[in-house]
Amino acid sequence: MPAAADDVAATDGRPVNSGAPESAPPGPPEATGLRLLAVHAHPDDESSKGAATMARYVRSGVDVMVATLTGGERGDILNKAMERPEVRANLPRIRREEMDKAREILGVQQRFLGFTDSGLPEGDPLPPLPDGCFALEKLEDAAEPLVALVREFRPHVLLTYDENGGYPHPDHVKTHEVAIEAFEAAADPDRYPGSGRPWQPLKLYYFATFHKARITALHEELVRRGLESPYAEWLANWEDEPEGRKALEITTQVPCGAFFSIRDQALLAHATQIDPESSWFACPPDAQQAAWPTEDYHLARSLVDTELPEDDLFAGIRERVSR
């Protein structure tokens, strides 16, 4: 699990759509005409945030695209079994290969947008970011490839991180800025000329993955089953909101428990980043379905009418597309 968690406030502390686990739909899906674009900083982010949601929508006929802003070139190797000289020497290539495997597992399309990983600076004071990295790009230069992709793919819904990046990685914060710029600019023919025909996405969501209500529910389910929980220390040390900063409200909970196993397969495809013995997999999928069978989001922008809370990222959009 990441070092820091999303700052969110659940609507009532439990998923809106808890109850019997849903089943994965059988057979090939019928095309819906709906399109979803998830905007991420690095390969592996797509598998740790919103992966089960994407798998569910793909298998219900939605076209799903992942935009990956960087290649993860400066990432650490977090799986000891992969800590080998030849892996370190070829990390950019290997991370692309891992992304290809995860893409196939999830069933999504995927596009690298060509920027260089900034790395996660450590120290006090923090060292300067490396020249040429994504986080130091001018906003217009960083946003242009995403604007072009939005105009090409023409998504109805965008997913990305909140203004704090979900956790304080400079590439995640920059990804938020770039996604906001693309959402606001892609429909304006006077902005980013030469980057395709204008297109306006209708909804923008922030991931709300690692929030206290969910982690507490997973912890309690493991304890109830007599299993060891890796979350006790995390919860004990949980830092509440800084004074003056409003928690991110959960507005939308997508039931996708039947796809948690697919999410986990996609995570494992990122072998340099995910240790199969790590706390990522401490809570079995069936326990997760029982405790918290949704993936959660905050609706940040909407150009369509929708009633909150939602259980569908396309609420308010399906009717338009089906006409």
Language model: regions and residue ranges:
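Short, well-ordered beta-to-alpha junction loops that form the rim of enzyme active sites
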Residues: 113-116, 160-164, 170, 206-209
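Proline-aspartate-enriched helix->loop->beta-strand connector
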Residues: 142, 146-164, 172-175
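Active-site environment of divalent metal-dependent phosphoester hydrolases
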Residues: 46, 73-76, 163-170, 212-214
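A mobile, often basic/glycine-rich helix-loop segment
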Residues: 137, 167-188
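Active-site rim/loop-helix segments in enzyme catalytic domains that contact anionic ligands
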Residues: 2-153, 181, 298-299, 306-309
